[in-house]
């Protein structure tokens, strides 16, 4: 027998439930009505612990509230077990009040409530002293009630929720089941003291169970381990010495890329806007709205360079009350606009108007966010922009209007932006993966063959890979820190793999793949299995109330 003595239990009327988990990772349930002939049988009902958490207390007052569901944790699990410390918890508002299992459509809970005050026991009403209530509720209505004396359950030790037939166990005993199978959507224990409560969330796996006279005496889990793969494929746990071919369909969960270059530089496009003097521009005729706009340039997303080289022949005019530039919302000059500034929107226009008030009034009347004034010693042909000065003549100047909002869609630059992407070759070994090797994609089982790579002639992909007859990659090379490393791409499924059984135990695997840690054996490789997953026998009693982990 490959895996001796996982459990030995006799079930009289219920599913068996593991109550105290210890450090183990599995529990096995099956119905007492499941009485197959003697021998090995593939059967559901094994649950693997995938998450463990604890909770000290969740009652904020001096006591918890009995006869009600006050605390719940959300799950999406095949099974959830909630266990108290080994001594259990008292049926008292000073310690334990309510535990429940939520199967989405209905809730099963256990509680106590010996109180007659108004508002007490909202779900159950008064429960007799020294009794507990096991109930099921759907759409706020109770459809199942069972009152039990505490002599049967002196303390609360565990409540377990199982999707199979929506089974619920109190202290290891089946106390509720239905003809539906639903995952656990929520569960919880409302308590004040006596904890902590341990929550163990589980997923369902198949199991191969060995029955004698209707009793499961041994269990091998179909969990992807070597023992599980062999036993569940051959539907038995008894193997004589020899070689046993097997198949294992690989589920691809990982991807990796092998790059030709350790880094790649990408130069992003830089859009240039070049402005020039408008020699035949007409002066305004009074007011800022008569200032004509020229060479309007609006930036979209990306990188931009604004070329104002023609301004070298103009004289910048500082802001002086009504005179000159006006750009308090722009903390830059046009000479520095390309210094890596960020904008959400940006538009630039040229205009010719009075240096006296032209900029300030343009900003006040929302023609621009900022305005920069430049003198070219122009004639006094521009009209005023203030009421009472609309017919007066003033010196004409160049006005540069900037309309902008701050953000990160647009960046100004003096030079094109170069983005450097650093590539790291993290190669996943000894499992089936999706790969992209030098641009060639596929699925494979990657092994390191550096120690065996001698005098390979690399032809494809710049001398970096050998291709097989189909054009797929067979062997590829990667530059490592200490030299070249060679890797072989094998099919995910090895049709030649065999388990090796010796002395009735699974001791190794023969494979055609050179996996990490394998030993060459003629034209194959041998992988030694050092420790099989061995479990010791569980105790036997005439009336099983719980099946603790060993």
UniProtKB/Swiss-Prot annotation:
Keywords: Cleavage on pair of basic residues, Coiled coil, Fusion of virus membrane with host endosomal membrane, Fusion of virus membrane with host membrane, Glycoprotein, Host membrane, Host-virus interaction, Membrane, Signal, Viral attachment to host cell, Viral envelope protein, Viral penetration into host cytoplasm, Virion, Virulence, Virus endocytosis by host, Virus entry into host cell. Glycans are attached at residues 23, 74, 102, 139, 145, 164, 179, 213, 238, 248, 265, 272, 277, 307, 426, 448, 514, 531, 543. GO terms for cellular component: host cell endoplasmic reticulum-Golgi intermediate compartment membrane; membrane; viral envelope; virion membrane. The record marks 538-539 as: Cleavage. Pfam families: CoV_S1_C. Disulfide bonds: none annotated. Specific enzymatic cleavages in vivo yield mature proteins. The precursor is processed into S1 and S2 by host cell furin or furin-like protease to yield the mature S1 and S2 proteins. The cleavage site between S1 and S2 requires the optimal sequence [KR]-X-[KR]-R. Cleavage is not necessary for virus-cell fusion. Residues 19-550 are extracellular. InterPro entries: CoV_S1_C (IPR043607). Residues 1-18 form the signal peptide. The keyword Repeat does not apply. GO terms for biological process: endocytosis involved in viral entry into host cell; fusion of virus membrane with host endosome membrane; virion attachment to host cell. It comes from the Viruses. Belongs to the coronaviruses spike protein family. Homotrimer; each monomer consists of a S1 and a S2 subunit. The resulting peplomers protrude from the virus surface as spikes. S1 attaches the virion to the cell membrane by interacting with cell receptors, initiating the infection. This is Spike glycoprotein.
